[in-house]
Amino acid sequence: MGRLKKLKKIRIHREGTHILWGSFFLLLIINLALYWGIDCKIPFYLVALVSIVVYLLMVNFFRCPIRLFGQDTEKIVVAPADGKIVVIEEVDEHEYFHDRRIMVSIFMSILNVHANWYPVDGVVKKVTHDNGKFMKAWLPKASTENERSMIVIETPEGVEVMARQIAGAMARRIVTYAEPGEECYIDEHLGFIKFGSRVDVYLPLGTEICVSMGQLTTGNQTVIAKLK
């Protein structure tokens, strides 16, 4: 019941709503000006077509779809984002764990939905936000030098999993809904990142990885790992 109740809280990111309305009126004004301002209608039709395509892409980008994971969530780690697996490797994590972890990174292109989901059920232990650079999100240094938010979750089995939202070259805003001490669930939105970006998930050594490099992921649907 807790999971389903909290699902109702988030539909569309409010900043996305403002941008969509602003873009709609701007494109409408541009197209009306072209329609009434020139005799030849060919430029109007071309601009109108481009406007429709651009606006539909923006609507797709700012969606926060509600998806239900149809399996048992015990020890399951799901993809926190739509995108592509760009990193699967052991790394030294220095911000929180201070030990070796398996990092799985999902890169989100500008065409992907940029809503983020919690990768595991549990309790939020820590949330931090760091301002940083805006390098291309697929670069290795982006994990530690770009604008980023860190969310640490303790699962019901006592395993700590970290999700890190990372801004990309075009992104200038990371939104995180997580609050320390609150319960969180698979199926629930974790946050939102504007434009090209990525999400890293840090897992204990020995975790069974269920994805491969280059694999496409669907947020809250693709199982990326199984905890021991």
UniProtKB/Swiss-Prot annotation:
Residues of the active site: S197
Post-translational modification: Is synthesized initially as an inactive proenzyme. Formation of the active enzyme involves a self-maturation process in which the active site pyruvoyl group is generated from an internal serine residue via an autocatalytic post-translational modification. Two non-identical subunits are generated from the proenzyme in this reaction, and the pyruvate is formed at the N-terminus of the alpha chain, which is derived from the carboxyl end of the proenzyme.
Cofactor note as given: Binds 1 pyruvoyl group covalently per subunit.
Site positions for Cleavage (non-hydrolytic): G196, S197
Function: Catalyzes the formation of phosphatidylethanolamine (PtdEtn) from phosphatidylserine (PtdSer).
Molecular function terms from GO: phosphatidylserine decarboxylase activity
Membrane topology: Peripheral membrane protein
Pyruvic acid (Ser) found at: S197
InterPro entries associated with the record: PS_Dcarbxylase, PSD-A
EC number annotated for this UniProt entry: 4.1.1.65
Cofactor: pyruvate
Catalytic activity of the protein: a 1,2-diacyl-sn-glycero-3-phospho-L-serine + H(+) = a 1,2-diacyl-sn-glycero-3-phosphoethanolamine + CO2
Cellular localization per UniProt: Cell membrane
UniProt name for this protein: Phosphatidylserine decarboxylase proenzyme
Main location class: membrane
Subunit structure comment from the entry: Heterodimer of a large membrane-associated beta subunit and a small pyruvoyl-containing alpha subunit.
Pathway: Phospholipid metabolism; phosphatidylethanolamine biosynthesis; phosphatidylethanolamine from CDP-diacylglycerol: step 2/2
Family: Belongs to the phosphatidylserine decarboxylase family. PSD-A subfamily.
Biological-process GO terms, alphabetical: phosphatidylethanolamine biosynthetic process
